[in-house]
Amino acid sequence: MSPRGLPAPPDDLPELPTTKLGQKPLWRIHPADVDPWFFDLGPDGRFNLAESGTCCLAEEPIGAFVEKFGRLLRPGGVIPEPLVDAQRLSSLRPPKASVVDLTDATVLGLIGLTAEIHSTSDYDLTQGWALALQEAGYGGIRYKARHDPRGELVSIAVFGSGKAPRSVAKAASIPVDLIHEASATFAITVLPRHHSRRR
């Protein structure tokens, strides 16, 4: 690690700032044929846990939108309409858990974390942090959405526990007003289906 790089988790973690889940619904955009409560075990998620998995959610619908589609943009900020139509927006009530709040400024002094934790592509390192925090007894991580250049939107990584959450998700097609919000805020354009076929 360079002197300015993201540090590895220490052997002994101090008490960290937390947020309680379970009071407000969280949001997730996912394929229509996939359960909203999907705990990803794969290596391609920032805070994925290899054994129990991690489910990434957003505090606002627009956060779920930008995290889902921000990495799939075509040149010009375009998303084909069929891709959007194949997804669902789910409102989920998370399990009651205490998650580490990595948006709290005190994590700089407590464990040396900077904003790089929210955006680095070194997933081996961020997954190492997730494992260390899970082993310390935390139920997940609150962090900044990578695809929001303003750094305002917040995501939640919920660690898998081996038991499926009891809450029932309310799934619906991506609403038009959310598409309009993404256009107004992030200049993301959903290309109508007939244009998609011409490409």
Where are these regions (language model features)?
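Active-site and NAD+-binding cores of ADP-ribose-processing enzymes
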Residues: 1-42, 46, 75-199
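Extended catalytic/binding region for NAD+/ADP-ribose chemistry, centered on the ART fold
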Residues: 46-75
